[in-house]
């Protein structure tokens, strides 16, 4: 159970956390990460909203099998998506560091 002062402190922390989350979400939306496949022969760059910004294909792949190129493009996109998700989790978990949250309370990411 929370005391009056404890509840007020928790509300203050929640407001601070909300402000930090908004700032971090704005930062993440502006970020870009690049995923790679085929040892860097295919690169896909996405932003924090998971929108594809650029696809780069090494010219040596253009004469190869179409199916392989498609697979590498998909793998590069998946790599980029995984990377931006890791950045999001890391930045969002940093927000709650130092907060005295109730046991079992998790911040949704």
Swiss-Prot record:
Leader sequence segment: none
Primary location recorded for the protein, binned into one broad class: cytoplasm
Alphabetic keyword roster: Cytoplasm, DNA-binding
UniProt cross-references to InterPro entries, sorted A to Z: YbaB-like_sf, YbaB/EbfC
GO CC entries: bacterial nucleoid; cytosol
Subunit text: Homodimer.
Family: Belongs to the YbaB/EbfC family.
Descriptive protein name: Nucleoid-associated protein BUsg_467
Source organism: Buchnera aphidicola subsp. Schizaphis graminum (strain Sg)
Lineage: Bacteria, Pseudomonadati, Pseudomonadota, Gammaproteobacteria, Enterobacterales
């Amino acid at each position: 159970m929370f005391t009056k002062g404890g509840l007020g402190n928790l509300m203050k922390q929640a407001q601070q956390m909300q402000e930090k989350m908004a700032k971090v979400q704005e930062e993440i939306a502006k970020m870009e990460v690049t995923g790679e496949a085929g040892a860097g022969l295919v690169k896909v760059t996405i932003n924090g909203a998971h929108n594809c910004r650029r696809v780069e294909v090494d010219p040596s792949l253009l004469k190869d099998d179409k199916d392989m190129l498609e697979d590498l493009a998909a793998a590069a996109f998946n790599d980029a998506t995984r990377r931006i998700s890791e950045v999001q989790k890391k930045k969002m978990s940093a927000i709650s560091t130092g907060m005295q949250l109730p046991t079992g309370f998790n911040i949704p990411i």
